[in-house]
Amino acid sequence: MGKIIGIDLGTTNSCVAILENGNVKVIENAEGARTTPSIIAYTNDGETLVGQPAKRQAVTNPQNTLYAVKRLIGRRFEENVVQKDIQMVPYSIVKADNGDAWVEVKGQKMAPPQISAEVLKKMKKTAEDYLGEPVTEAVITVPAYFNDSQRQATKDAGRIAGLDVKRIINEPTAAALAYGLDKAKGDHTVIVYDLGGGTFDVSVIEIAEVDGEHQFEVLATNGDTFLGGEDFDIRLIDYLVDEFKKESGINLKGDPLAMQRLKEAAEKAKIELSSTQQTDVNLPYVTADASGPKHLNVKVSRAKLESLVEDLVQRTIEPCRTALKDAGLDVSDIHEVILVGGQTRMPLVQKTVAEFFGKEARKDVNPDEAVAVGAAIQGAVLAGDVKDVLLLDVTPLTLGIETLGGVMTGLIEKNTTIPTKKSQVFSTADDNQGAVTIHVLQGERKQAAQNKSLGKFDLADIPPAPRGVPQIEVTFDIDANGILHVSAKDKATGKQQSIVIKASSGLSEDEIQQMVRDAEANAEEDRKFEELAAARNQGDALVHATRKMITEAGDKATAEDKATIEKALGELEVAVKGDDKAEIEAKMNALSQASAPLAQKMYAEQAQQGEGAAQGEQAKSADDVVDAEFEEVKDNK
């Protein structure tokens, strides 16, 4: 069995890790970094860039550079958070035929799982380059508060990337695994506070020793899947835009290039203000008007940044309170607080968390890598390489069905340990009702319409009977990934209907298969592009070497030699500018043949010169010989 890698598929950055010889190794990518920006760019020459190369060109290509796409995964276009996102990003978010939020690049609509799959492919390749063998299996993390649609969409992204997703695991749970595996024996309860680039989660986790086994039991989880570092950046960007408008009268909001530069500068300033009290945001030539170019230069203090984002930090406290209440615990019952996610490096976040929980958070957990490390440990557990770990996770939201009067009736309550199965008997609402529609919902509201619709299916051919007589047993079954399977059975006839919830939105099996094929075709395209680039480089090198040879040959090259070589050179230079690899190789061969006679002539001449020089050296050394007398000395020891 091959290795099962652990992937933290983040909103802002992603990370991949593997368990090797009992230790978890976070794997560096091709650029030498341990985390990879979750950014994908589509260039004008048809190349797809992922990670740092995509981030570097974002300023000049904002409309075709996609970031924070995880915030759209498994979401409907009409959702408020999506409408809010549309106002914040320079790329185009569009409504798919099924009502989902998709993105559009260069006139082509793409599903968020397709975009996330590009990041996963980069993670997969990073692991393969390190291990020297193909990788096909992975554990991928998601925010604990992701609903069923978002989990399913993440699994789909893995399939599109060519990965068999062995388990979807919650990010705070993964971080607790990374923290708790090597800790002292005995039971203790930890809070994992995970504030990442786009999502916020908090989980109450009990780490216990049961018969020599590490047991990680999630007692409760809560969160906000649209709150993270990106929102902190936006507050600072808005402030910088306002300051610039006050000074110059120009609103930068309508200029995508300027806004992309501002985004980068704001992120950099935010990071700097975690370790300094003040920083300058300096963007020369940010825009221009009739009077000439304009420069942005704004001083930002840590206090100013904190005042801009204070309410965002406070928004994280209510989920903490709810999670504790759901777990039936007080703040005093918490032994350790673990901070995960890059945004937790902000001093205000650390101070607020410490004040609420009455204790400083631990500093020995790497907030950027802990989640991937935990995913790798879970991968090793599934592969059988780690034996003494048991993970008991929960479903984050209540699952139920719509019943008479538009009411949501819960079958599986939030924070129920998974996997789990629950059945309940329902009946018909009308006399002689021949079919019932099972409308599956997820959420905490009593009104069905206020919750997330996961899907509908019909149970037909119910024998005629007065209302309330037929007995229809609805069974909810949640697997270890937190993904729901629902069935309904007429107890009188034994007739059964079931679905794996694919959400009323989501990707169909055909769409996923098509995207898998597209991804494979893209991999082939990428390979061809690399080969073409290599051929162009070889062609350029040969042109350079041949011109150098002609220069060095001087008078030794006849006019005929030069004419033949120049013709072949010109043809190769034209071929190198084209896109035909075979043509480049053919013209390289032609140039090699055309220049061969001159090369041989020069080689022969060099050889002759070499021989002449060698003979001269020999004669010289013969003249320099000095006769000497030697006396043998015997060494008596």
Swiss-Prot record:
**Triggers of expression:** By stress conditions e.g. heat shock.
* Biological role stated in the UniProt entry: Acts as a chaperone.
Q: Which residues carry this modification: Phosphothreonine?
A: T199
Q: What is the similarity comment for this entry?
A: Belongs to the heat shock protein 70 family.
Please name the Pfam families in this protein's record.
HSP70
The record's listing under InterPro entries reads:
ATPase_NBD (IPR043129), Chaperone_DnaK (IPR012725), Heat_shock_70_CS (IPR018181), HSP70_C_sf (IPR029048), HSP70_peptide-bd_sf (IPR029047), Hsp_70_fam (IPR013126)
Name of the protein described by the UniProt record? Chaperone protein DnaK
Source organism per UniProt: Pseudomonas paraeruginosa (strain DSM 24068 / PA7) (Pseudomonas aeruginosa (strain PA7))
Record GO terms (molecular function): ATP binding; ATP-dependent protein folding chaperone; unfolded protein binding
Q: Where is the signal peptide?
A: none
